Structure formats: structure tokens, C-alpha cells
């Protein structure tokens, strides 16, 4: 008989390698709910509370903390223990005054990078693409699965691969960072994940091959990565703190 509906289970051995979990301790893992990020680039909120922050010893304790509304993601209370928390998301715990940004490390694992309360009010969004919608609006489709509407007159200010920095949870754009030579980028995937530096060159290829970006890191070393892996986070210097 054919399977009906999406999968609702996940074995730990098959979980994304970006998760910091014990793969052989138990058989099953929590499968993220459909939401802002893909499963590969996010982790269920319950693991943030229990395994990363250590605020609970069991899943039951972690779910109780979430149900009490003590954990905020991008400034909003999230109670769904399966909620996917991904790259550039801000996790806040008001009771303790802690704030973290989710970023990958050099081995591709998702980590919680401590940030200040002021920085927790800002979140960078990468523009994956854009499209026209009713009402003379342009819809910006962002890296975390969300979207943002801008007026038709502003459409040329927002291009694919640009980054918009928004206030959260209000989602008001405060700065636009163009994808261009000299821009400061952070690599989110690939063998050079978590490396950072300035764009030196953008090479385009025919026949549908992906664009390649050459980046110069802080030590003057050059390396290449795919354009889709390069996340602009500043012009001359990063607008957010990094590990």
C-alpha cells in the first residue's frame, strides 16, 4: 500500500549531520515540523533547549519549558517542540537574558553563538528570489522560507543574493547589503563552511552551471565557493558578530 502523507518519524542515524546529538544513544529523533528552514539547515527547538542549552534532562521537561513560553525565536514565543531553528535565527531566553544566533561551525555543525541584546533585535535575510504579486507589490522570498513585500518602485533596490537586515520581530528593513565585489560574506555550506572574508571575484558559467565566488579571508588566503553558499553580512566589515 502506498504511503499517505509526509513522513512523521526520523531515525537518529539518518538525522542531518549538522545536528549535535548522540546518534547511538536512542533509536529515534525528533523530525522538524514543516516550516521556515529545510531539515538540513535547521534543528528542532527541543534539542536547543535540552541538548544545546542543557535546561532540561528529558524531552518532557523541555516541552514543559516551551509550553510556558520561555523560549523566543526571532523575538516570538515558540511552543512547538518540533519548530525548525536554522541559520541566522535568534534564540532568546528572557528570564536569563541570554541571546544566541544559530550558525554553522567549521565542521558543518549548527552551534549557538552568544550575542548581545542589541544584536538580538537584528536578523540578516538572504534574498533567494523575488516575484510580482497583486497590489503592485514585489515579494522577496528569503533564505528561511519566509517572504517580505516591498513596493514596485523599490524593486531595483532588492536583487537576488542581496541581504536585507531586519528588526525582529517587527520585520522592518533597516539595511540592504548588495552582493558585489568587496562585500563581506559568511559561507553557510560546502567544504569551506563557516569561513568568512571579502568577495574578490564572481565568475559566471554557461549551460546552467552555478556561479562561483572567490573570497579572500582575514589571512589573505583565497578560496572558492558556490554563490548560493555565500551570505553577505556586511560591506567592509560584518554587521553581526561571528564565532
Swiss-Prot record:
Domain of life, source organism: Archaea
Q: Report the PROSITE patterns cross-referenced here.
A: RIBOSOMAL_S4E (PS00528), S4 (PS50889)
Q: Which CDD domains match?
A: KOW_RPS4, S4
Read off the SUPFAM superfamilies from this record. Answer: Alpha-L RNA-binding motif
The GO annotation for biological process reads:
translation
Keywords from the UniProt entry = Ribonucleoprotein, Ribosomal protein, RNA-binding, rRNA-binding
- Ranges for domain S4 RNA-binding come to 43-105
Listed GO MF terms: RNA binding; rRNA binding; structural constituent of ribosome
Entries under InterPro entries matching the protein: Rib_uL2_dom2, Ribosomal_eS4, Ribosomal_eS4_central_region, Ribosomal_eS4_central_sf, Ribosomal_eS4_KOW, Ribosomal_eS4_N, Ribosomal_eS4_N_CS, S4_RNA-bd
Gene Ontology CC terms, in alphabetical order: cytosolic small ribosomal subunit
Family statement: Belongs to the eukaryotic ribosomal protein eS4 family.
Oligomeric and partner information:
Part of the 30S ribosomal subunit.
Can you name this protein? Small ribosomal subunit protein eS4
**Which gene name does the record give?**
rps4e
Amino acid at each position: 500500500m502506498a504511503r499517505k502523507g509526509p513522513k512523521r518519524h526520523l531515525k537518529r542515524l539518518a538525522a542531518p549531520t549538522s545536528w549535535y546529538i548522540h546518534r547511538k544513544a536512542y533509536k529515534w529523533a525528533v523530525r522538524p515540523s514543516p516550516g521556515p528552514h529545510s531539515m538540513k539547515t535547521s534543528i528542532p527547538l527541543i534539542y536547543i533547549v535540552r541538548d544545546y542549552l542543557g535546561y532540561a534532562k528529558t524531552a518532557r521537561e523541555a516541552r514543559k519549558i516551551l509550553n510556558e513560553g520561555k523560549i523566543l525565536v526571532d523575538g516570538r514565543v515558540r511552543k512547538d517542540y518540533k519548530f525548525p531553528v536554522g541559520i541566522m535565527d535568534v534564540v532568546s531566553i528572557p528570564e536569563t537574558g541570554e541571546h544566541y544566533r544559530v550558525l554553522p561551525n567549521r565542521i558543518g555543525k549548527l552551534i549557538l553563538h552568544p550575542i548581545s541584546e542589541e544584536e538580538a533585535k537584528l536578523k540578516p535575510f538572504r534574498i533567494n528570489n523575488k516575484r510580482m504579486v497583486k497590489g503592485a507589490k514585489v515579494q522577496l522570498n528569503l533564505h528561511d522560507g519566509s517572504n517580505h513585500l516591498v513596493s514596485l518602485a523599490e524593486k531595483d533596490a532588492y536583487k537576488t543574493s542581496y541581504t536585507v537586515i531586519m528588526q525582529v520581530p517587527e520585520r522592518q528593513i533597516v539595511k540592504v547589503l548588495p552582493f558585489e565585489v568587496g562585500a563581506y560574506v559568511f559561507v553557510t555550506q560546502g567544504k569551506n563552511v563557516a569561513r568568512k572574508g571579502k568577495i574578490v571575484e564572481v565568475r559566471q558559467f554557461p549551460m546552467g552551471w552555478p556561479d562561483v565566488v572567490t573570497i579572500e579571508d582575514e589571512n589573505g588566503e583565497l578560496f572558492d565557493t558556490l554563490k548560493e553558499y555565500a551570505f553577505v553580512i556586511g560591506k567592509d566589515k560584518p554587521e553581526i558578530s561571528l564565532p
